[in-house]
Amino acid sequence: LSLLWVNPSLAKLGSAEIVGDPIVNNNKVTLRIKVKEHNGRPALDLQDENFRLIVDGQPVKFKPQDWKSSRETTPPPVWIVFLLDYSGSMNTKDSKGTSKLTGAIDAIRSFIFATAKRNGDTRVVVVPFGEGQGVAANCNRPVTNDEIDRFFPAGDFKIESQLKRLAAGKPCASTNIYDPITETVKFFTNPEDGRFTVPEGEIKPRTSIILLSDGYQNKVGEPASFKRLISFLEKQESVIIHTLGYGLTPEELGRKYRLNRTAKRSDIGIGKPVKEEEFVDKEKLSKIAQVTSGVAEFSPDAQAVSEKLDIFLDAILGEYEISYLEPNPERGSKRQIKVIVTSDKDPKIESKPKDYNIGVFGRSLPRNHRLLMVFGIGTILSLGGFLPFWFWGKQLKREVLER
């Protein structure tokens, strides 16, 4: 069956990636593969026939039973930081009349419940962020290593206790998005933290940030700060950031205020047509997700927030798995593999190649070969011990008879 026949609504394929390093166990190689649609969302409905493996330029076959869908694989270890906008605008209501803070926390609660049902080793922390100075100093919500390093397993009651405390609070800070992202990425990429760095040949934990904001960076010097942030994010590859804008899109704001165009940052402020608390910087949130291979979504109401977080969950945990036997193992040799994903109506997409090494002991011989070798060696040893003794016995007997 073709992919599009199985799921006619599936968007066009966009990219394929071999996640982490191939795992080599004797003659068996196992890959984890992430496939995205053209819009950046995870492609979850592929079948085994949509995948082809190329090792050192040659196709390699795998058995259907050695392929696992994104719903069948055991999730890898995952660490998720929820960066929750705790600015004053989160007290306002969304397009359906729900408090944004209430809607966001309810959606996070549903996300964590769904994550726990996946039965993987997933740890989560919710970190509120916002900046308060002067008379608003009590509104300050800085993101520090201590605030980040409060992970609990998904489903742990301590997370629910934290969500209740946040829901009972009253956000009053201004929005500072870039610094919290920077501090969280630095936390995850600390080379001295053994939780996020593992020896070669082991599954590397996934580290993800989910940023939920209903606003924009309103500090002085924003353009330069954003440029520095993007430059910083482009230099790392291990942390994926998914961004969720909570509110109306600039296009929707343009229609609401009859601008006859998309709303811009220049449209907000005193004497301007768009209310400051309604503007969400879609362009910047999308760019942050793009440079880290994340997903960018927008939600006008609480129900949509929950639905978008489900997409993020699949993006974080949705990986295919394929195992195959190394066709030409040579002890200590290096191999290169790439994955090709196809469908009937889309052009094929290829992953970047990944290198892996065959162990110095090579692969085990088939069982029949091992049995033949044991039998042969046993026979040689038996004959080698028996025949000399037999000839010696005959010689002694002959000498006795000749006397």
Model-inferred region functions:
Residues 1-4:
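Bacterial N-terminal signal peptides
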Residues 86-90, 130-135, 173, 215-219, ...:
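Solvent-exposed loop/turn segments at secondary-structure junctions
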Residues 12-94:
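Acidic, polar low-complexity linker/tail segments
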Residues 148-206, 219-220, 243-254, 280, ...:
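Von Willebrand factor
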Residues 76-80, 90-92, 116-119, 130-182, ...:
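Short, charged loop segments at secondary-structure junctions
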